[in-house]
Amino acid sequence: MRFFMLIGFNLLTALSSFCAAISANNSDNVEHEQEVAEAVAPPSINIEVKYDVVGKESENHDSFLEFYAEDTATLAYNVTNWEDTNITIFGVNGTIVTYPHGYPVADITGASIGPYEMEVNGTSKFGQDVTLNLPEGQYFLIPFLLASRFDEIVRIAAPPTLFEIVSPPISFFNPQFLSVQVIFLAIIGGVSYYYMKSKTNQRPSKKSATVKKVDESWLPETYKK
């Protein structure tokens, strides 16, 4: 009996040790994952970024701003520093993704700006031009600002903007439109010609008018033929 009790006690001890080892291993894994996440996560920064698309202001942020292919969108930024230290804005870039799936289709060419030294609670205003060389469709525009805080470089995402590339209106002097007009006028001219010709062929010929003899009895002899 004591032998079986001893075996059971040893089994419980081994099982407890195994569970403790698993728990410690899991704890180490969780800590390692947290360390990795902290290492790859972008540094947080308390910066408020607002911008307007010049000439395309809209009160409804859910509506699409309309552009034609190869139009240039001018972004007017208004940036406020809520950090407890000065920061410097020195660059802008960004990306364009499809709506609603979010597939990247283009990068916004990076550009150097400023640099703008922003004090605590300070505000800076500047602009950025983005060429929309895209096919027709609906997209998200997602700008990023590049800033430095001490010796740390941070990338600040601005709010996305919905926009749509639409087909341009057809000009009256567009060659394609002119060709359509020529064909249309040719059809109308041909139909009119054959209609008038058929009406002419169906018109009855005039009968030769009979010459009536004029009563000349009342005329003086001098005027009679």
UniProtKB/Swiss-Prot annotation:
Q: Which gene encodes it?
A: IRC22
Extract one GO cellular component term from the record: endoplasmic reticulum membrane
Native species of this protein? Saccharomyces cerevisiae (strain AWRI1631) (Baker's yeast)
Presence of the UniProt keyword Membrane in the record = yes
Keywords, sorted A to Z: Endoplasmic reticulum, Membrane, Signal, Transmembrane, Transmembrane helix
Stretches the record annotates as Disordered = 203-225
Q: Which family does it belong to?
A: Belongs to the IRC22 family.
Ranges in the topological domain labelled Lumenal: 25-169
The UniProt regions of compositional bias labelled Basic and acidic residues, in chain numbering, are 212-225
Q: Which residues lie on this side of the membrane: Cytoplasmic?
A: 191-225
**Membrane topology of this protein:** Single-pass type I membrane protein
- What sections of the protein cross the membrane? 170-190
Q: Is Mitochondrion a UniProt keyword of this protein?
A: no
Q: What is this protein's function per UniProt?
A: Is probably involved in a pathway contributing to genomic integrity.
Q: What is this protein called?
A: Increased recombination centers protein 22
Q: Which residues form the signal peptide?
A: 1-24
- Xref: InterPro entries: TRAP_alpha
Locations listed in the record: Endoplasmic reticulum membrane
